[in-house]
Amino acid sequence: DDYIDFMYAGGGNDRHFTDYMADSVWGRYLVDGDREAALRHLPVMRHIYRLWDEKFDFDKRLYFVEPLLDATEYTVSSIDASGGKDGFRGGDAFRPSINSYMFANARALSRLAAMAGDEAMARDYAARTEAIRGHVLADLWSEKLTHFIDRHQSRKNPHVTYWEPIRNRELVGYLPWMFDLVPDEARYAQAWRHLLDLASLAGKAGMRTVEVNYEYYMRQYRYLGPDPECQWNGPVWPYQTTQVLIGLANLLDHYQSLGPVTRSDYMRLLRQYTALHYQGAGKAKRLDLEEDYHPETGQPIVGLERSHHYFHSGYNDLILTGLVGIRPRADDVLEVNPLLPEAGDPQALAWFRAQDVPYHGRRIAVTWDADGSHYGRGKGLSIEVDGREVARRPTLGRLTTAVESARNATIDRPINRAVQLVRGQFPKGSASSNTDPENVHDAIDGRLWFFPELPNGWSSAPSPAGQWYAIDFGKPVVLGRAELAFFADGKGFAVPRGYRLQAMIGGGWKTIATPRGSPVADGITFLRWPAIRTDKVRLLMTPKGGKAIRLVEFKLFQD
């Protein structure tokens, strides 16, 4: 809800980058069945769709975009449009990506409009959907390359010609399958052989974004000081790998013409992708997904401080809808089709279980146990709804069962009375040291993370002396619990060795909570007390070894 509201009501969708947000709203509806939530922003969704007309070529009937604004700088179209000298900006192109996104968004708007009873809008966007499909198939499919490709949209460019197709395959050519835009025909399915070809898009450690025989494959153009910056002329990108694996899952799930790819290929590529999520070895092995990777070594390319904070994997969705095979539907049916190869295949799995998955207001579990020995629940594939088994088959394959929709569980949204939405207004923070306004504000800004590269929170001065942080609400409020978050790095910052919470009651400070021991480092410490009414609260802290204290967030609630 928060993300959708931000994109459609909070001003978050300025169309700076291409997106398939409307399709995501429909996809969310398929999972939770919440009709009201799905339709809440329909007028705004339609308005934003129409704003994309500025990137629509009314002669060619296709959308175009500068690759940078497709979040894919340094593509074939942008590099070639620069004469091979750059590629960060420029290179506008009719791309499989933006046209697939707009196809999916139009289809979602048609379905949502029909659900809302607006048949005219439903017909309008259904027609738009099919028009885009027709032009993508007619104009972006290359018989020569057997792949969906870009066409240049740049006019008056000395290096490329308007409407000319690009000269090499790119991974983006698989995105039409992500949204079932592609017909179930053998001529299109043959495109998937390039994903398996080491001389094309298949790297030893991941999917190349451009095939290896491109003239400027892996040429590094952009640097931040001595460090290479992000480019899409060959490196593996988790964001697009996710998209391609969703498309491949669609192909394997409900297409008859599969071309050369198999479920074994899917699992191998999924395992390959899984490996990119880890860095280090042995006891030092850790989850750490970065921006992009070298397709032959699997090592990060950019590796800047920001790189560890890219949230573009989509990995959970691949596991639940692909490997486990939960295929969300609008009706009261649960459909499961795990994309596992048969026993004996090197990529086969003998067992898995996905549990407590929310679906149409229920909690479902899907279990696969090839011989029944792992879970002791019987052999085969089974589905449970709210803890009760409702369907089973002895072998891998498609399994469906009726699931009566229920009201989704209410989301608990307690109000943090301490958050300072506007600097300088109540509630106001104050502190014993390091009283820079931004430093003080950071402890009550509502944001919570523990990343050393992105400091957030009030940081005290390093000192053995006691420290305090106080909040003035400007009026009496009722409080009954707190959540405290402290950062520790084993270096300059440590959690306090002692702490207590006080409130202004009857004109003086009175202790309302004195926990034992130290608070949690890089996590949440919960405090409770009998509800009190006060206008001021302060946290008293005793530093550990004279180290600084970073109070990442100080939250206070009524109950």
Give the predicted meaning of each segment.
Residues 450-513, 518-559:
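Aromatic, loop-rich ligand-recognition surfaces of beta-strand-rich domains
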Residues 54-66, 101-190, 204-205, 264-303, ...:
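Catalytic cores of carbohydrate-active enzymes
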Residues 31-97, 124-131, 137-150, 192-220, ...:
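Active-site acid/base region of carbohydrate-active enzymes
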Residues 28-40, 109-124, 251-259:
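Inter-helical turn/loop segments and adjacent helix faces that build the functional surface
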Residues 230, 247-418, 423:
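Non-catalytic C-terminal accessory modules of carbohydrate-active enzymes
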Residues 1-75, 81-83, 95-103, 170, ...:
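Aromatic-rich carbohydrate-recognition surfaces in CAZymes
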Residues 416-450:
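Predominantly extracellular/luminal regions of secreted and cell-surface proteins
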